[in-house]
Amino acid sequence: MRFAVLLLPLMLASPALAVPPLPGPEDIVAEHARQVDSARMKRTVQKLVSFGTRHTLSSQTDKRRGIGAALKWMEREFKRTGLETFQVCDGATGRRIPVTTLICDVVAIQHGTERPNDVVIITGHIDSRVSDPMDFTRDAPGANDDGSGTAAVLEAARVLAKRKFPGTIVYAALSGEEQGLYGGKILAEYATTQKWNVVANLNNDIIGNSCGSDGVCDAKAVRVFSEGPRWQGREDLAPRIRSLGGENDSPSRNLSRFLARLAERVGPPVNLDVRQIWRNDRFGRGGDHTEFLNAGFPAVRFTVAVENYNYQHQDLRLENGIEYGDTIDKMDFGYLTGVTQLNVAALAWLASAPPPPEAIAEGAVSTDTTVTWKPVAGVNSYRIHKRRTDSTNWAPDPDVAVVTCEDKPCPPELKTVLKGIRVDDWVFGVSSVSKDGYESPVASAVPGGAFKPYVAPPPTTP
């Protein structure tokens, strides 16, 4: 078996011989993003608000008011896209659920044509609340929290449902978030039971306002939160990360880097910068992506650049001249459209790209570094990445190494030696590249860097 290690050349096309290029991956996903309809999203949020309250403990049988009516409407809207649609439910009780209550998520699946078990999931929570998390009778419009994320999920399904992708996309409206992230846990457990290879969970929670409660406005950026050292397997991973690195290289952190780079590469219509926030979530707050992390899946949270706390978890009221409550008139639908466009571009790209490989880097007491990885089924091209240990993002080197199998299939293990590059000074990673140019997120060659649930190695025999 032969494989070639190449250096990417800097190529210049002669103007005299130039021909119109075929659309590249950036052009294709940008065109998908352009289909996002701001007016349609506003109508979606208006409909969600019309249910009065979507509190998890509200009526499940009333046809016009409560969580049950909202879930049934969402299910009908998903079915209109032609996708396989169903509810995943489980009973729950807890600190904010005093009696056992049925918690349901509405799920729509767009099955992949080549790799149906490789899955990217977009989520938003459909339930809402007021000041008292146990009050399920007052109106809780939940326009931004999280009608905005729910609208993004539905709009993504409307835009992408008629396209075909190698991998699978799952669209989900989750319940029970405000009562304790129950909907996220239910879907993460379902994904585990189905043995999905979840490449990414893109959780959208509060993505529809651009001005904060202090008057500061920022409509040019979206925050993406990602965990550092991965939670799963931390007891086994901790000493290995301490020795070999990986504090900043969880799959979720690399998913965040991927999203930031994607926003740059795609450009208009995605006119937002990704502000990478390197912690799992905001101080003292939580979101459904955490339950995907607990299950071992890469997950990030999208949320606005500046939050307005007067409009979150508040009874509708006017107090001391200040208006409180999460109503639709406080939203910025132009901003929501931009965040949704980034999500659509990311879903299309991730469902088109192969999953990242699992890699390791070695080079102790050597002036060279050896990077080894297991090839992904059906993928013959891989890119080696490096960055300084104190650098934020992977270096965009023009001479980055590319490994391509010259015969099919690739051997069970691929390896390349980076001459004169000392392992101590760098973090290394590997990405997979499809035949049509879609590159996966980078998987860091560190303990816990693989895009899969972590399994501790067996104990060493003395």
Predicted regions and their residues:
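Metal-dependent peptidase/peptidase-like ectodomains
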Residues: L174-G287, A295, A299
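Active-site-adjacent mobile loop/cap segments within catalytic or ligand-binding domains
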Residues: V49, I207-F225, Q276-P354
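Beta-strand-rich modules
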Residues: T416-S440
